[in-house]
Amino acid sequence: MTEQLNVQQMAEKLLAADNILILCHKNPDGDTVGCGSALYYALLALEKHAAVLCADPIPGRYAFTNPRLFKGEFEPQIVVAVDVASVQLFGEGNGVPQYTRHVDLCIDHHAGNSGYAEFTLLDGSAAAAAELLYEVICAMHVEITPHIADCLYTGLSTDTGCFKFSSTKASTHITAAKLMEAGAHVEELNTLLFDTKSRERMEAERIARNHLEYHLDGRCALIYLTRDEIEQSRVDPADLEEPVS
């Protein structure tokens, strides 16, 4: 059974260790990548050994976050998961299972978190794990640099659909404003994350529209892609996080 921590207690746990492994979930999205990267750079600022491990490659659209990827170069004192609701979400690749048998810390915003970690910072009302991690990094007295702000904004904006989802609250916008004040490149990030599509994504959309169906007396429109069609378009599955528009 996990023990629930508050923000300050989580910050103290992280400050007490020198070698820290950060775990993201498989098929990584903007929140888990953004949090993993932001925490890595915060720990680096404290002159700690840290690295990020994920079962799957970081999607190209998030390459700018550029965390150090774990290659087994140190023995972790603490394993911390970010935006991971259950052990099953870690995946099997990259030797991840070796480090998921005992997860020390978890920072998450999913109300259904299974409580797999020894200690958990959980707020099911938060729009993204990045919203919680921002508070943790501040509690660690680490400066929110422009790059850390970019990473956290990536998590915050992608998990809220660019602040369109119902999970978005006033506090979400306040956190975003603080990240802007810290130097987050919001205009560039919004263009990259929400307005830029690869040629492969455009091809996938073209194929999907061939399946257009109307239901509920025309009030609902449905499109879809089969696995074979995804392979045919050669689209990166990460590029399909956002719905076709």
PLM segments and residue spans:
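Short alpha-helices
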Residues: 110-175
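Active-site cofactor/cluster-binding pocket
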Residues: 63-119
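A generic local secondary-structure boundary/capping motif
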Residues: 11, 68-70, 93-96, 120-123, ...
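Hydrophobic helix-and-loop "lid/oligomerization" segment in the mid-to-C-terminal part
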Residues: 2-61, 70-78, 158-245
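Short, motif-level signal for alpha-helix interfacial/capping segments enriched in acidic residues
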Residues: 2-9, 85-86, 137-139
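Glycine-rich, phosphate-binding/catalytic loops in enzymes
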Residues: 39-40, 96-99, 122-123, 174
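Short glycine/serine/threonine/alanine-rich loop segments
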Residues: 48, 102, 142
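Conserved beta-strand scaffold positions in the cores of enzyme catalytic domains, especially
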Residues: 52, 104-106, 120-121, 220-222
